[in-house]
């Protein structure tokens, strides 16, 4: 029932609808604000879908929707510019995607979040939160720490092996 979290979710669903509408028709929200429970976090989840226009293809749709609004915010281009200005390091794989493009044109991808990245003998993992004008700094930090909870637990378990 947090007004900030609800407003953030509404913004993200609207952004997804807008992104899909570039190359799809019949864009709709299949389900809205379902709660999904994980070991360290609870997420509001909505699914937005559409039917690809005849003159569009999976690759164009991917390009037009990437990065996901959940990692960029809105307005997407300006939010990404601000992220680039403020964040001290390039995000690397975080917020990118992993997946495949089939020879038949099929495309399946997932956003890289809550993932370990091993680089030059160092292990990296990242999390973020939706920071807006009415955000509570402490709550946003707590959200990031909660999101990293499962990865942190995995490190502690691995240290005992």
Regions of interest found by a model, annotated:
Residues 1-161:
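Extended alpha-helical targeting/anchoring segments
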């Amino acid at each position: 029932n947090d007004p900030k979290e609800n407003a953030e979710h509404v913004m993200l669903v609207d952004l997804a609808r807008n992104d899909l509408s570039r190359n799809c028709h019949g864009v709709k929200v299949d389900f809205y604000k379902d709660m999904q429970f994980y070991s360290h976090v609870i997420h509001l989840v909505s699914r937005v879908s559409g039917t690809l226009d005849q003159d569009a293809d999976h690759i164009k749709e991917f390009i037009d929707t990437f990065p996901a609004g959940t990692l960029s915010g809105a307005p997407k281009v300006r939010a990404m510019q601000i992220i680039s200005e403020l964040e001290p390091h390039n995000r690397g794989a975080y917020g990118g995607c992993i997946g495949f493009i089939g020879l038949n044109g099929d495309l399946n991808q997932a956003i890289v979040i809550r993932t370990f990245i091993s680089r030059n003998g160092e292990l990296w993992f990242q999390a973020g939160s939706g920071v807006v004008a009415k955000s509570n700094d402490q709550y946003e930090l707590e959200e990031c720490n909660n999101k990293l909870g499962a990865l942190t637990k995995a490190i502690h378990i691995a240290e005992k092996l």
